[in-house]
């Protein structure tokens, strides 16, 4: 199918449930050649009119991809607990791109209380979503994993994105959402 091979999507669904606590049907999973491709799909899905909040400092390539897709971006400051709620609320972002499990470049891990606050932010207004970029989350050796935003989202406001480029090999560029 255009969303990825059925067997691969089934395997990803099992992996997500077992290791990240995410319950997703294989039909809900989209496989792509790299996260850049998936970010472009997200802009097509959620719209170019929306303002995409990106972490500052953060993965600058995401902001460039959103801008190339015709979307406007807004910087959202990061502190020792990840995305600053105050900065997010002061921005005009409708969609937040965040890496709560291992923020780049700070390495901050967003605590569960702030994750719940981020979900409340998304639920507070129609058209708000969170793109959870879980890149590099498999490499947590000292701390117990905190639940992903997607696994505790009850309102369907989180789009989970990850890749196998760090765990398998960088060459295949297999990413999924």
Question: What is the meaning of each model-derived region?
Answer:
Residues 1-129, 137-159:
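Conserved core of the PLP fold type I
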Residues 151-177:
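Active-site PLP attachment segment
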């Amino acid at each position: 199918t255009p969303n990825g091979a059925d067997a691969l999507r089934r395997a990803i669904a099992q992996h997500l449930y077992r290791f990240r606590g995410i319950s997703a049907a294989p039909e809900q999973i989209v496989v792509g050649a790299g996260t850049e491709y998936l970010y472009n799909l997200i802009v097509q899905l959620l719209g170019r009119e929306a303002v995409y909040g990106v972490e500052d400092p953060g993965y600058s390539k995401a902001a460039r991809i959103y801008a190339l897709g015709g979307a406007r971006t807004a910087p959202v400051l990061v502190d020792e607990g990840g995305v600053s709620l105050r900065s997010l609320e002061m921005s005009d972002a409708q969609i937040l791109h965040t890496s709560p499990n291992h923020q780049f470049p700070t390495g901050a891990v967003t605590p569960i209380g702030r994750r719940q606050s981020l979900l409340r932010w998304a639920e507070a207004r129609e058209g708000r979503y969170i793109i959870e970029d879980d890149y590099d989350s498999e490499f947590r050796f000292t701390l117990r994993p905190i639940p992903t935003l997607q696994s505790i989202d009850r309102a369907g406001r989180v789009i989970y994105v990850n890749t196998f480029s760090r765990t398998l090999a960088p060459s295949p560029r297999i990413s999924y959402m």
